[in-house]
Regions:
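Active-site-adjacent "lid/gating" segments in soluble enzymes
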Residues: 2-133, 137
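Aromatic-enriched alpha-helical interface/lid elements that frame and gate functional surfaces
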Residues: 121-170
Length: 170
């Protein structure tokens, strides 16, 4: 605050676990805590498995990027201000509408492994030669081509998103 009083154009960026104020502001903040509290860990993993944490410093890295971007925007504005980035809010942003949906409906998206509820099939698959491929079919036209390559292009169960979702495990 003293620095801002001396230089009204100053942009200060603060990065913390839970923000500068509020009930958790004084608590230690670590990426693992934010990943658990945001629901990311609960959402990650196989349907019948335990919650999983990301195998990289995802929260730290993404929060750093968000803070850097917000700082650049603040500098571009020419108006002095404090940029307050924190680990938990950054993870809530990554969770997209899932947090709001849970708050409104009480429904939690189930763990789908590498799958997404709106893209079927999606995942990594071992080929007959032992190598791996990554597949994501976010539209019916892409799914039709993938199903054709797999030899099930004429199977009506996989023609529509609804059909592919109903037969996700096949």
């Amino acid at each position: 605050d003293v620095l801002l009083e001396r230089n009204a154009a100053l942009v200060m960026t603060r990065v913390s676990g839970f923000g500068q104020d509020g009930p958790y502001a004084s608590r230690p903040g670590f990426a693992t805590i934010a990943e658990a509290m945001s629901g990311l860990a609960a959402l990650s993993g196989e349907p019948d498995g335990q919650p999983l944490l990301p195998p990289i410093a995802l929260t730290d890295e993404v929060t750093g990027l968000a803070a850097a971007f917000a700082t650049m925007v603040a500098l571009h504005s020419g108006v002095g201000q404090v940029v307050d980035a924190n680990l938990l809010e950054t993870m809530f942003q990554l969770m997209g509408p899932l947090v709001s949906l849970y708050g409104i409906t009480g429904e939690q998206q189930p763990r789908l492994g590498a799958g997404l509820p709106y893209t079927v099939p999606r995942g990594t698959y071992r080929c007959s030669d032992g190598r791996w491929i990554a597949v994501s079919t976010s539209s019916d036209s892409v799914a039709a081509r993938v199903m054709g390559v797999l030899g099930v292009g004429d199977d009506a169960r996989f023609d529509t998103f609804e059909g592919r979702t109903a037969h996700r495990l096949e």
